[in-house]
Regions:
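Extended intrinsically disordered or low-complexity regions, especially N/C-terminal cytosolic tails and loops
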Residues: 1-29
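Long, charged low-complexity segments
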Residues: 3-7, 78-218
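A generic structural signal for ordered alpha-helices
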Residues: 6, 24, 31-32, 38, ...
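Short, solvent-exposed segments of well-ordered alpha helices
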Residues: 8-19, 37-48, 70-71, 122-133, ...
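Generic structural concept
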Residues: 22-25, 29, 47-54, 133-136, ...
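N-terminal interaction modules that seed assembly of large macromolecular complexes
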Residues: 30-87
C-alpha cells in the first residue's frame, strides 16, 4: 500500500496532467471552429491538440496505479519501461487489466444530506472508454498525410463531430472519481478539473466498508 506522501505525489502528477489537458482541449476547440481559415489545417491542428489531451488523460490514469503498472510493464515482451509509453489507447488497455474500474467516473455536483456531501454518478453523455479509443484512432489517422491511393479519412465528418468529442471530454474530467485497488482495499480520489479559470484539485479518500461498483457504468 502506498504511503500518504506517495499518494500525494501521485495526485499532484494526476492534476498536472489534467491542467495541461484542459488547455489542449481549448486549443483543439479554437481550431475546430476554423481559426486558420483552411479547413484541412484546422481539423488536423484540432486533432493534434485533442489527441495530446487524450494522452494526458491516459498518463494521469497511470499515476494512482504507477507501482502496479510499472511492475506489470516490466513483464512485457517489448519495451519494459513504462516511462517510454506514449500510446493512450494501449495505456488504457493495460490499466484495464490491472483495475477494470480505473477509468474516471464523472459525477454530479455534491448534494448535502445529513451533514455530509454526496456525489451521484453523472448519467448523461461523456467520453466513455470506447469513445476515447475511437477518437484516439481517428485523430491518429488524420495526423498522417493522405495516401493518394488510400481511403477517404472523412475529414468533414470528423470536423463536425470534434466539438461534441471535446465537450464529452470536458464532462469526463470536470468532476469525477477514480477507484484505486491496492493491498489494503479500495481507495477513491475525488477530482475537480474545473475550467480554464480554476486550478484542478483533488482529494484522497479511503473506503470504509464496501464500495459499491456498477460494472455497466464503466464503458
Amino acid at each position: 500500500m502506498s504511503s500518504d506522501a506517495e499518494n500525494q505525489a501521485s495526485l499532484k502528477t494526476y492534476l498536472r496532467c489534467l491542467e495541461e489537458a484542459k488547455h489542449r482541449l481549448a486549443f483543439a476547440e479554437s481550431f475546430a471552429v476554423g481559426s486558420t481559415g483552411h479547413p484541412r489545417v484546422d481539423i488536423e491542428s484540432a486533432c493534434l491538440q485533442f489527441r495530446k489531451a487524450l494522452e494526458l488523460i491516459a498518463y494521469a490514469a497511470i499515476a494512482p496505479h504507477r507501482e502496479k503498472y510499472s511492475a506489470w510493464r516490466r513483464q512485457a515482451k517489448g519495451s519494459k519501461d513504462y516511462r517510454k509509453d506514449f500510446n493512450g489507447k494501449k495505456i488504457l488497455h493495460s490499466l484495464s487489466r490491472l483495475n477494470p474500474y480505473f477509468y474516471p467516473r464523472p459525477l454530479l455536483p455534491a448534494v448535502e444530506r445529513n451533514g455530509a456531501k454526496h456525489f451521484e454518478p453523472f448519467r448523461g453523455e461523456y467520453l466513455t472508454k470506447k469513445r476515447y479509443e475511437k477518437a484516439y484512432d481517428r485523430c491518429g489517422a488524420i495526423l498522417h498525410a493522405d495516401n493518394p491511393w488510400g481511403h477517404d479519412k472523412q475529414y468533414e465528418n470528423f470536423s463536425k463531430e470534434m466539438p461534441t468529442y471535446i465537450e464529452w471530454t470536458r464532462t469526463l474530467i470536470k468532476l469525477h472519481s477514480v477507484l484505486i485497488e491496492h493491498s489494503g482495499g479500495v481507495a477513491a480520489w475525488l477530482v475537480e478539473a474545473g475550467d480554464l479559470t480554476t486550478k484542478a484539485r483533488g482529494y484522497i479518500g479511503k473506503g470504509i466498508g464496501e464500495i459499491s461498483v456498477d460494472p455497466n457504468y464503466y464503458g
